[in-house]
Amino acid sequence: MAARLPACVVDCGTGYTKLGYAGNTEPQFIIPSCIAIKESAKVGDQAQRRLMKGVDDLDFHIGDEAIDKPTYATKWPIRHGIVEDWDLMERFMEQVIFKYLRAEPEDHYFLLTEPPLNTPENREYTAEIMFESFNVPGLYIAVQAVLALAASWTSRQVGERTLTGTVIDSGDGVTHVIPVAEGYVIGSCIKHIPIAGRDITYFTQQLLRDREVGIPPEQSLETAKAVKERFSYVCPDLVKEFSKYDTDGAKWIKQYTGVNAVSKKEFSIDVGYERFLGPEIFFHPEFANPDFTQPISEVVDEVIQNCPIDVRRPLYKNIVLSGGSTMFRDFGRRLQRDVKRTVDARLKLSEELSGGRLKPKPIDVQVITHHMQRYAVWFGGSMLASTPEFYQVCHTKKDYEEIGPSICRHNPVFGVMS
């Protein structure tokens, strides 16, 4: 058989879709997961409208091109990680494959990703789109958390390659804490945190709006996003951080310069407390969301405590970060410190309650950071889809035609170096 073309790896997220070919270290494209369509509410006879419908179906844009299209309606087919509008998703995939990857779908196997707790019906819909509309030869739907674990093997902190660990996946729209044992997600213990990149942007926007008058209102969101991505970091201690800024402001306060979209004049703002207060809402959610007050370190601890007792130690030892919102400087260090404090306090308490008769063995808490975090899921998919095993576990077009879309309800785990 001639050399196989590499598989296509597509990771669709709420905010951005990462796409590229297996075997590469980074995605060829990272585009916003949005689609601009013509919404025709024209009055006319049926035949005329049917003709228009056919034309309108081809008249759409995705990604960056879709964001500033004045006569189009911009839609985001994915919310909180889960696909909501399948018709739009099909059209989105069409341009992903033909316009961006420039691939002939009949020639490439595909690895797509799914969020935790995705329904089996959604997998069937995905299979129908890929096999019926695009006629792909093989499809594998991978769980994002497992791919993020595989991506963490690039970190120097990882000794053995294991698919057991706790994945903190924080993107633009949702943050999940997902325990994985031997490549299988422990579904009943997953917790989701209603704080993600978008909330940090909104919170930063609020802080800037209260203080900086010079930002043009229509640009306040993109300014907040740029400030967050460029200057934000996680601090070890809030009170000390405030006093650092108060005593030596010139050293810590940064300047951000933007251009007014209307008048084309430059505007300049000072970025102070916002730098550390933005990401702080992971550790003090009550700053931004009065309904949710549990810090991320407590959520991680609770998730692991809910898991079967024999996997708890490995889960503490391998806490893996994934997604753009975990990229803040010192995020991993602060999380490790906070989880360690919670765990040590519990061990100390059990020792005291036993009157000193029990000496619990200390628990090793390790948060793993690596340079692939931003697109860890995509990179994990790229690694696994370039192994020969991948082609053995893929669901093929032949299976699909014989059995139907239900074959994609289950995707076997592979890639554990056994």
UniProtKB/Swiss-Prot annotation:
Main location per the UniProt record: cytoplasm
InterPro entries in the cross-refs: Actin, Actin/actin-like_CS, ATPase_NBD
SMART domains from the UniProt entry: ACTIN
Keywords linked to the UniProt accession: Actin-binding, ATP-binding, Cell projection, Cytoplasm, Cytoskeleton, Nucleotide-binding, Nucleus
Single GO molecular function: ATP binding
A cellular component term, taken from the record's GO annotations: nucleus
Matching Pfam families: Actin
Keyword Protein biosynthesis: no
GO biological process terms, semicolon-separated: Arp2/3 complex-mediated actin nucleation
Subcellular location(s) of the protein: Cytoplasm, Cytoskeleton; Cell projection; Nucleus
Keyword ATP-binding: yes
PROSITE patterns: ACTINS_ACT_LIKE
The family this protein is said to belong to: Belongs to the actin family. ARP3 subfamily.
Complexes and interactors: Component of the Arp2/3 complex composed of actr2/arp2, actr3/arp3, arpc1 (arpc1a or arpc1b), arpc2, arpc3, arpc4 and arpc5.
Role noted for this protein: ATP-binding component of the Arp2/3 complex, a multiprotein complex that mediates actin polymerization upon stimulation by nucleation-promoting factor (NPF). The Arp2/3 complex mediates the formation of branched actin networks in the cytoplasm, providing the force for cell motility. Seems to contact the pointed end of the daughter actin filament. In addition to its role in the cytoplasmic cytoskeleton, the Arp2/3 complex also promotes actin polymerization in the nucleus, thereby regulating gene transcription and repair of damaged DNA.
Protein name: Actin-related protein 3-B
The encoding gene: actr3-b
